[in-house]
Amino acid sequence: MLLILKAIILAIVEGLTEFVPVSSTGHLILVSDVINFKGDYANLFNVVIQLGAILAVVVVYWDKLLNSVKDIFAPDRRGLRFWINIVVACIPAVIFGFSLDDYIDKYLFNPITVAIGLVIGGILMIIVENKYRRRSKTKNIYDMKLRQSIFVGMFQCLALWPGMSRSASTIMGGWIAGLSPVVAAEFSFFLAIPVMVGASGLKLVKSGFYMTNIEFIALIVGFVGAFLVSLVVIEKFIKFLQKKPMRIFAIYRIFIGAILLILAIFKIVTI
């Protein structure tokens, strides 16, 4: 039952943090360290709950995704442009992700690097939002230009550092490229589908598939939990972006990251 409890905790953490700019991977690393959830099974579990979160994107945006497929052959080819933008934006992360995956897993998946990523990412969010949020020109995702998707894709590579946040990186890239807050967030959500499915597939292959019955049950609990929490968070986050700045997330990141670094520097705790 302890494993099930850990699964529920981590599923909630994943669902709450995957699509907001605070780094779900960073939070999973920190919480896993606190509840002593480590090893090969833990790595597999984290992959599976991320897939649950991705399924939530598909469900929330099912109509828009379906219409974008139908619109591939529309006279204005807007559906085709949409999918070309998604594919192009994925390329940088695919290249760097596959090339650096082992290095990242070995050297960057620890609380200290997460804390550094949280602080740096938070500072960047404040700077970028203050300068670029109100300069947006593209207010419809179908109007995105190829250069904008390339720029967002390059920024997504920042998220290879745990703690930086894929959501924060892509939204910041979108703002600088001229996307409105909502378009930047939605493009970030859509971009998460192929990128995270690919990354999760790679880790699944490396992890293997053997597990006990209770471990399998915990996987199901985690998957469903992350899916349900993500459903709520996605819709709430879009409504939040329409009215309020993301500064609160940046402040939260800087606060948590700074506390962790102070604790480590003064050796109050070992992280």
From Swiss-Prot:
The keyword Transmembrane helix applies. It catalyses: di-trans,octa-cis-undecaprenyl diphosphate + H2O = di-trans,octa-cis-undecaprenyl phosphate + phosphate + H(+). It comes from the Bacteria. It is a multi-pass membrane protein. One of its GO terms (cellular component) is plasma membrane. Keywords: Antibiotic resistance, Cell membrane, Cell shape, Cell wall biogenesis/degradation, Hydrolase, Membrane, Peptidoglycan synthesis, Transmembrane, Transmembrane helix. It is found in: Cell membrane. Its EC number is 3.6.1.27. The keyword Metal-binding does not apply. One of its GO terms (molecular function) is undecaprenyl-diphosphatase activity. Catalyzes the dephosphorylation of undecaprenyl diphosphate (UPP). Confers resistance to bacitracin. Belongs to the UppP family. This is Undecaprenyl-diphosphatase. It comes from Clostridium tetani (strain Massachusetts / E88).
